[in-house]
């Protein structure tokens, strides 16, 4: 959301500053290293048609491409790409650094400045004041972020990254209410420990696909497969035994999750009659052994996560890089926004992405395009 917002504003002539906590994490995909999918792939192509960059970046960094829903009509065909997570970041950064009118500043916003009900700027952790006609907040899961692995809690906006503090409270002073939501991410697996012969390979499609309508015909990176397998009743038994230490079920986490992101423990509780759940093992990049286990998002204790996964034949010798975890974060009630995503209480303050209670890279990116802020003449000075 932040990348598309900054690029759109600058390309339309506004003098723009993109403030980010870490320039080396611009456009970081916080969860799975993939773009598109059912309903979402169409959104990426609409972003591209409107002049956005998400499709171009995805095409440049894709390591697998597939079209989902082929059994349905063309309107339902959904492009989906696995991406190299790190190359995705650097492709976005290269684009943003070369857009006229766009400056990048590495810092953390802690306070908004408001006069007579209208935004006038922000103040950062370093004490720098930026005066602005318009401010777009795309803070993701970083506002007062708190991560959970079992009963262990650690402040942060993402694994090994600090949370953002004071900004929520600064906004709330102006009558904008906020709540807490939670989401989660799965373990990252060392590919050298996986028995691929016990999984079903899922190759990309050999016919050429891309997201962008721009004339880019080169497949930049080596194309890699994904793999699929299933949980089993022994896995579910171990997960059930760990539920007393699950933050989702022992009262440690009180907040709710956005739609479409259920944890594995939620699946076994919600669907106790299902003997198995499908998992997808996805490569994180062209040159890394790190793998993402789609379908096994969890905040259970690390030893429970590992013990359960080792009951799957392909993971009997499992080695992980880091456990799955849940994260709680602040969000702002979207009923306080106009249809343009401008806040009703503060003129020219816009929210986009996960801070509105949404989820997904594509949804976050496209929300920016519902806002007139970048193309409003009064904000271009």
Language-model regions, residue ranges each:
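Flavin-binding catalytic cores
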Residues: 170-179, 235-251, 297-325
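N-terminal Rossmann-fold NAD(P) dinucleotide-binding loop
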Residues: 2
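C-terminal catalytic lobe of FAD-dependent flavoproteins
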Residues: 263, 270-283, 287-302
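Conserved N-terminal/central alpha/beta ligand/cofactor-binding core
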Residues: 7-113, 126, 138-158, 162-168, ...
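A glycine-rich dinucleotide-binding beta-alpha-beta segment and adjacent secondary-structure elements
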Residues: 292-358
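A conserved FAD-binding loop/helix module that cradles the flavin
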Residues: 157-160, 357-367
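Conserved small/polar residues in nucleotide/adenosyl-binding loops
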Residues: 369-374
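Core beta-strand elements of the Rossmann-like FAD/NAD(P) dinucleotide-binding domain
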Residues: 125-134
């Amino acid at each position: 959301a932040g990348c598309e917002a900054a690029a759109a504003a600058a390309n339309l002539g506004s003098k723009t500053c993109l403030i980010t906590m870490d320039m080396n994490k611009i456009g970081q995909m916080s969860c799975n290293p993939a773009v598109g999918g059912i309903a979402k792939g169409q959104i990426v192509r609409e972003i591209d048609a409107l002049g956005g960059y998400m499709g171009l970046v995805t095409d440049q960094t894709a390591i697998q491409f597939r079209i989902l829903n082929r059994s349905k009509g063309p309107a339902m065909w959904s492009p989906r790409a696995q991406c190299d997570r790190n190359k995705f970041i650097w492709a976005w950064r290269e684009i943003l650094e070369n857009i006229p009118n766009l400056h990048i500043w590495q810092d953390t916003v802690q306070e908004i400045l408001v006069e007579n009900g209208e935004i006038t700027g922000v103040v950062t952790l370093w004490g720098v004041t930026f005066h602005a006609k318009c401010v777009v907040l795309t803070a993701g899961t970083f506002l007062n972020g708190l991560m959970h692995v079992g009963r262990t809690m650690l402040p942060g906006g993402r694994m090994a990254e600090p949370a953002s503090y004071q900004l929520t409270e600064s906004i709330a002073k102006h009558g904008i209410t906020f709540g807490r939501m939670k989401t989660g991410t799965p373990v990252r697996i060392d590919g050298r420990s996986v028995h691929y012969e016990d999984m079903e390979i899922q190759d990309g499609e050999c016919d050429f696909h891309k997201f962008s309508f721009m004339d880019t015909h080169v497949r930049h990176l080596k194309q890699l497969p994904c793999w699929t397998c299933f949980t089993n009743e022994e896995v579910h038994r171990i997960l059930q035994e760990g539920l007393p230490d699950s933050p989702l079920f022992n009262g440690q986490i009180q907040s709710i999750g956005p739609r479409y992101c259920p944890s594995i423990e939620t699946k076994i509780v919600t669907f106790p009659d299902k003997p198995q759940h499908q998992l997808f093992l996805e490569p994180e990049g062209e040159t890394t052994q790190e793998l993402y286990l789609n379908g096994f998002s969890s905040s259970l204790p690390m030893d429970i996560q590992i013990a359960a996964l080792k009951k799957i034949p392909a993971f009997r010798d499992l080695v992980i890089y880091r456990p799955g975890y849940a994260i709680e974060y602040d969000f702002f009630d979207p009923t306080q926004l106009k249809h343009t995503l401008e806040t009703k209480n503060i003129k020219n303050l816009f929210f986009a992405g996960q801070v509105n209670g949404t989820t997904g890279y594509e949804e976050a990116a496209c929300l920016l395009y519902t806002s007139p802020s970048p193309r409003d003449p009064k904000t271009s000075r």
